[in-house]
Amino acid sequence: MKVMVIAKASAASEAGEMDPEAFAAMDKFIEELINAGIMLDGTGLTPTSRGARVRFSGSNRTVTDGPFAETTELIAGFWIWKVSSLQEAIDWVKKFPNPTIEDSDVEIRPLMEPEDFAGVVTPERLEEVKELEARSRDRDGYGLARFK
């Protein structure tokens, strides 16, 4: 199964503050994940002050420039892992160095697989989706292929 591991933002991450020791520990941990064959992709995110949010309401789109106030709901970084179970992902996250200089939360969410859409789309479309997914995995440059 594939999971997204989500590091929640904090006041420090939103201020763009990085602790060099925490960064070095995370770098070493990521190397361990890659060597174990767990890590597929991932990166830290810039503070929301450098981003935007698009709100959908029917056919209307409203753009709000960052920063965004509700820090506990924001994401500071993410990783995509391939694990055998949710418990394996939990066990790896427990080994995480704290990604911020403050208390922090890390969320784990399984990714939907093409089979999760059975009953919503036709079997033919499921095959097309699987082909698209394979092409995405095999591409060069930025993307999932960079951690092969």
Locate each region found by the language model.
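Conserved, structured core segments of small domains
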Residues: M1-K148
